[in-house]
Amino acid sequence: MKVGIDFGTTTSTICRVTADGRIDTQGPIPSLAAYGNGKWYFGEDAEQRLAGEDRAIYPIRDVKLMLGKKSIRIGPNQLDPEEAVSKYLSYLAGRIAKGEVIEEAVIGTPVNVDMAHRQALLSAARKSGFKEVRLVYEPTSALAGAIDLSRLDERALVLVVDWGGGTLDVAVVRKDGDTLREIEVDGDVSDLGGSRMDDELVREVLQRDASLRSKVDAIDGGFDRLKQEIEGSKRNILEEGIDDETAEPWRTPSLWLRETIEVRPADVFDVIRRMADRARERIINFLHRARINPSEITHLLFAGGVCNSPIVQKAIGNEFRSARAVSTDQQPQLLTGYGAARLARSGFTVQLAAPFGVRQCDDSFCEMLPAGHGLAVGAYRVAEFMVTDVLAPEAVFDLGICRQINGESAMMSAPGDAFRSIDQLHIRAQSTPGENKANAGDLIRLFCGIDSTLAVTVYAESNLTADSVRKSLSGVPLAIRVGR
């Protein structure tokens, strides 16, 4: 069986490809775990446990953002986040697999999480019993879930805004035959997600009630547990269609606190507006860095739970008045999982969308990996660079992508408007600065490749100093070729 999964920070979706090619969807499902008395609880069961009186049940929120860390503190317990995610993915699979073996799982991943995060996610998924696990960027997966690729005009330039509980990811995508080609991608991890909105609402509630703050502070896991209840109040205010900011507070009896929690609609709308304004600024800055004028965007797709808000859609959409909204029957928060299932059904390959390499001080560009280079474990390309500056204690390599592909030569001009720097790599080039004379044998070798984590890894070694440096880079634009 094949599945597509959107493992979200606050909600998740799992979609099953049936034997006759249909896609069954379950979601949104709370991305919530709880742990207490040696037992795990997930999803709605975790919500119910946390709403009860037992204070020895501890919430595990936002565990997606903890992947890559060695341990997390949950109440008095130290737990492995990879184990928590593995158990949660098994729980998701159990809701839809009905005892069948999951042969392939396609899982969405935020654009800018690091390699350690993705390695931990892949490991957790395999521990859950998934035989083959593949990753795709969440916004492009959402686009695959929203459209029929055969009907997308190749002249269309689509901006995908995928805003969920933990991340704001954006991608500018163009269709190129049977390929979804990412022109540029970017992502914010944990700063603008819907979970941060809940943090601000919790602070608003606690600032108004000092006695409540004292109670929450005295309980292990109290802040996260209160945050869970306030998130529910926020969701109810939005789903009930309350649009009067002067309306009465939403009141929720809290059994574990023995208090009634009040959340004001005015606070909810104020927080959403502030976050929407920050998101709009980030998107405009992203397009500016990509040298894309907002007027060039022909289509706009909103994905993720936060984008359900009319306030968010209006704040961002006003910058793209000439763009057409991508129409879809799916809810915004279901698109990434549904798109992942579509990709699993049709088959796909992942390639670099643009050449990756090194820009040097004379603006020349040494291409390390060409556009179209596919994912392959252990398949590295090598380039050698002579050490020519005998006074410099270290060599500096500017790593990034070149948006222009001029001919077949590996050496090309990469001026500022064509090259986007992603990171720099520094390596010691001399044992004693200023005393060594450069010669033809003084070399720094760069090994470069991209693997199933979607991260480009660059490994540098100096034959003069025997130093070596390894760096992994996320956020490289990719091309998704649909079909087998």
Residue ranges of predicted features:
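Conserved phosphate-binding catalytic cores of ATP/NTP-utilizing and phosphoryl-transfer enzymes
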Residues: 1, 134-161, 289, 334-349
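Gly/Thr-rich phosphate-binding beta-strand-loop-beta motif of the actin/hexokinase/Hsp70
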Residues: 1-23, 149-183, 442-462
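Early-domain small/polar-rich strand-loop-helix modules and first-structured segments
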Residues: 1-72, 134, 188, 193, ...
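Phosphate-binding loop and its immediate beta->loop->alpha context
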Residues: 18-128, 199-243, 405-407
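Conserved phosphate-binding/catalytic loops in two-lobed NTP-binding clefts
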Residues: 129-141, 313-339
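Acidic low-complexity intrinsically disordered segments
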Residues: 348-484
